Regions:
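Conserved beta-alpha junction segments in alpha/beta enzyme cores
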Residues: 13, 17, 160-193
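Short Gly/Thr/Asp-enriched flexible loops that form oxyanion-binding sites at enzyme active sites
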Residues: 73-89, 232
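N-terminal glycine-rich "phosphate-gripper" loop used for MgATP/nucleotide binding
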Residues: 67-78, 97
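Short, acidic/small-residue loops that bind anionic groups at enzyme active sites
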Residues: 84-106, 113-120, 241-245
Length: 278
């Protein structure tokens, strides 16, 4: 049984969503720490910057927790004062996605364990395969994804995996926290973005970072985006001659399988991806 300390550095959670997440997590066998007081704050942030930062520091400093679990995404991670590197790397595991892509990049760079997967409030909506995938990732066990590609029997060797929300990754450009994409499988997903915004974010990443040197780009779900968003993204990636796969079970829907930043992965000629765990 895994114990999670809860934190919030982004937007506040609606009471019904919070309650549903708590009930789902407890029913799945997780032990949970206390909910930070600032989670109910009004406005677009779950409390002021210091209150949100304190919730993260408390979660990371816990000696009883197996991992620190973000309650919700939204916005706020990038403006939250972060704890020292010793808390980020001291054997800590951090779980979240969406706005938390920012924190995952920092935790990974500091030597901590960054897991891209459901936040607490989205865990209530996660399908059973996604819940099993989260347990497997937390345990460091291998997982398999079936991807699709139009590259025929394209097969690439093992490489580490990173990625997350496209819009958030684009905002990391020009900061000390922007990850190195070269030689990695990079997983991208997004939610509620118009075609031109997706185009702009990806184009900016390709021109202003080393994303064009990625081992390959793996596209997840583009939820609540206009129809045709995923094919558009695939065309944009292929225009840069970067190997591309689609239909990764990652995103803002019921299907959101966890992956660990930096874990090794390989893809065979049939599009089966093996994430080897860590």
């Amino acid at each position: 049984m895994k114990r999670a300390e809860l934190f919030t550095i982004s937007s506040p959670a609606k009471l019904e969503r919070l309650q549903a997440g708590l009930e789902a997590a407890l029913a799945a066998g997780f032990e949970l720490g206390e909910v930070p007081d600032c989670i109910h704050s009004a406005g677009y942030l779950a409390g002021d910057d210091d209150a949100r930062a304190q919730s993260l520091r408390r979660a990371l400093a816990s000696k009883e927790a197996d991992f620190a679990w973000a309650i919700r995404g939204g916005y706020g991670a990038a403006r939250t004062p972060l704890p020292g590197a010793e808390l980020l790397r001291d054997g800590n595991t951090v779980l979240g996605f969406s706005d938390l892509t920012y924190l995952l990049a920092i935790v990974h760079a500091a030597g901590g364990r960054a897991i891209h997967g459901p936040v607490l409030t989205s865990f209530a909506d996660a399908d059973e395969p996604s819940r099993r995938a989260l347990n497997a990732a937390l345990a460091g066990e291998p997982r398999r994804w079936q991807l699709q590609t139009t590259d025929g029997k394209a097969q690439l060797g093992a490489a580490p995996v990173i990625g997350g929300n496209l819009a958030v990754l684009a905002t990391l450009l020009g900061t000390q926290h922007c990850p190195q994409f070269a030689g990695h499988y990079v997983i991208l997903e997004d939610v509620g973005e118009a075609h031109y915004r997706l185009d702009r974010a990806l184009n900016h990443l390709l021109r202003a970072s080393d994303l064009s040197q990625a081992k390959g780009i793996i596209l997840g779900h583009f939820v609540h985006c206009p129809e045709g968003a995923a094919p558009l993204m695939e065309r944009l990636v292929r225009a840069h001659q970067i190997p591309c796969w689609t239909h990764a079970p990652v995103g803002h829907g019921h299907e959101n399988h966890a992956f660990i930043w930096g874990e090794q992965a390989s893809i065979d000629g049939e599009g089966q991806m093996v994430l080897h765990g860590s």
